A protein has these predicted regions:
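Glycine-rich phosphate/adenosyl-contacting loop at the front of the ribokinase-like
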Residues: 1-55
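Hydrophobic alpha-helical segments and their boundary regions
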Residues: 4-7, 72, 104
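Ribokinase/PfkB-type carbohydrate-kinase core domain
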Residues: 39-41, 50-65, 69, 76-194
């Protein structure tokens, strides 16, 4: 804190819930279509993601390029002693993607995985019919016959019920840790043996 901290190593990779799920399925040899959806910037990181998808057998046809925004990225700093991590995140192009360009009828996929609510500003925006744009997108996927799954980001805020709540009606599989579940439901997490 306000002193020099040395960096002892660096690596680059793609990540995030949807990408990690796709990559894991590709590496397991999934015998069904894998397609990415979202938005990257017209920059080296965006090109890296598109190339990495293709290299791993993930069809990037639903990943658009925004010429006016940076590709979203996270710098993760891990303490050498103890392994505690701090995440510095640039929302970039992800903040502007609302999924309106996604045509589920043009996809051969069977499941739509949305991640991360609370980190995608346009997806988290209000929708007059569904509550949020994310809920509308999940409903559209279900209407097209896809199963849906959802992952959220852990944050210290009061937005969970407002943003995640409406989406739950349109989710087949929801991935929450105990802290996220507590914030969505309003039920306090038990503290140890109490």
């Amino acid at each position: 804190h306000e002193t020099l901290a040395n960096i002892h190593g660096q690596s680059q990779g793609s990540g995030g819930s949807p990408y990690n799920v796709l990559l894991d399925l590709a590496k397991m040899g999934a015998d069904f279509p894998l397609q990415g959806a979202g938005l990257v910037g017209k920059d080296a990181l965006g090109q890296y993601i598109l190339d990495d998808c293709r290299r791993n057998g993930i069809d990037p046809k639903f990943i658009a390029v925004n010429e006016d925004a940076l590709t979203s990225y996270t710098d993760v700093m891990t303490e050498k002693e103890g392994g505690r991590r701090t995440f510095f995140h640039c929302r970039g192009a992800n903040a502007t993607w609302d999924g309106s360009d996604l045509d589920f009828s043009a996809s051969d996929c069977r499941i739509f995985h949305l991640g991360y609510l609370l980190l995608l500003d346009a997806i988290d925006a209000e929708d007059p019919e569904y509550g949020t744009r994310g809920a509308a997108l999940l409903a559209a996927a279900q209407d097209a016959g896809l199963k849906t799954s959802l992952d959220v980001v852990s944050e210290d805020s009061d937005r969970f019920a407002r943003i995640v709540g409406p989406a739950l009606k349109h989710v087949d599989y929801c991935i929450l840790n105990e802290i996220e579940a507590s914030k969505v439901t309003g039920i306090a997490v038990r503290d140890g043996d109490k």
